Structure formats: C-alpha cells, structure tokens
Amino acid sequence: MNNAIRIMDLPENERPREKLTRYGVESLSNIELLALILRTGNKSENVISLCARILERCGGLNGLFNANRGELLNINGVGEAKASQILALLELTKRFRSFKSGENYNITNPKDAAYLVMEEMRWLKQEYLKVILLNTKNYVIKVKDVFIGSLNSSIVHPREIFLEAIKNNSYSIIICHNHPSGDTTPSKEDINVSNRIKECGKLIGIELLDHIIIGNGVYISLKEKDIL
C-alpha cells in the first residue's frame, strides 16, 4: 500500500503553509518548517513524519546544521533530492549568517546584537567571548573572537578587547559570550568582567554598550537588566 502523503493531503488545520498564512512563520515547529522545504514524504510515511525522524536522527537542529551529504543519505527515506534540498537550505543559512556579520548591519537594541551572533554561539560546547566593534552610528565594523573558556576576571584581560577596538577605529563595543548550558543567568564572574571592561573603556574613550549572554535560542542583556 502506498501511504505517501503530500502536505496538501493533510487536514487543512495541520498544513504548515496554511498555519504560516494564518498565524505567521514563527508559529511553525522545526518539523513543519522543514516539511515546507521538502514538500513530500515517501512511500511509507508523510512529510511530517519524515521530517520528525530526520530531526530526531540528527539530534535536533544542531545536528542537522552540521550534517553532511553522507550522513543525510544514511537516513532512511532521504535520497539525493531531499539531501540536496536540505544541504542547500543549510548553506543559505550559513551564507546569511555571514552576510549579517558585515558592516551594513546596524545595532539599535540588544536584540539586534543577540541575533547577530545567536546562530553561531547557541550551539557552542564551550564558552566563547566575542566583541562586536561599532562605528559612530552603531554599524558593525567587525565581530571578533577574543577569548575561549569560562569567563574569569583574572584571565580575561580588557587589553585584548580594546586592542581590537583601537586597531579597527571602533567608537564603542558590545561583548557577547555564550553559556553552553543554555541558562543565560549571569554569574558573579560575568558581572565582574563586564564592570572591569566598562571601567577600562571609560579610561580610553571606547564605551562598552552592553554585555549579551547567549543561551539556546535565548539571550539576556546586562544593560536591560540594569546590571551594567
């Protein structure tokens, strides 16, 4: 028996495209978003079931984002066509992320800063500290890794951060680091490092605008929380 079901064969209230139109793209699950890309299932399952299994096999979005052609083809029901669709989607995502790192990206609020680095930092298995260098109009000049490892005020030296800022004629900076646990609650050391960098910035005339902590798809702004 051929059980292949297209999205259009599903009840209307279960169709991802109709849900997108009615409620917005944000309302769709990861499975439904992937289903819109792949469009059809196979002889034994519909596209929703197939996409659920793909994400489960890959270990979620993180695994899918890092999957290669061979790994995708090893998933039952994924042939050359569907593997190519997924790889094209992943490549577009990577290129878009790279595009956003350019100097045409303007930061007007903490959300802008968080979204600039979110997709890269949310999956990291250890802590990274990045500095976003800004010009006088808050356009991004550069995003630079300055430290890898747990933040500690005795290890993280402001010199490394402001050296990059001075080299790139930065007017102000935003620092961002990730919590691999996904919990964005700032630690005592996070706060100490922020204050130390802020004070050093005052001395040399380069303002620290914010410290953004990245979790798994969420963030916290120390500025918004009145911690900085």
Curated annotation (Swiss-Prot):
Residues 106-228 form the MPN domain. Keywords: Hydrolase, Metal-binding, Metalloprotease, Protease, Zinc. Zn(2+) binds at residues 177, 179, 190. Pfam families: RadC (PF04002), UPF0758_N (PF20582). One of its GO terms (molecular function) is metal ion binding. InterPro entries: MPN, RadC_JAB, RuvA_2-like, UPF0758, UPF0758_CS, UPF0758_N. A motif (JAMM motif) lies at residues 177-190. Gene3D superfamilies: 5' to 3' exonuclease, C-terminal subdomain, Cytidine Deaminase, domain 2. GO terms for biological process: proteolysis. Belongs to the UPF0758 family. This is UPF0758 protein CTC_02075. It comes from Clostridium tetani (strain Massachusetts / E88).
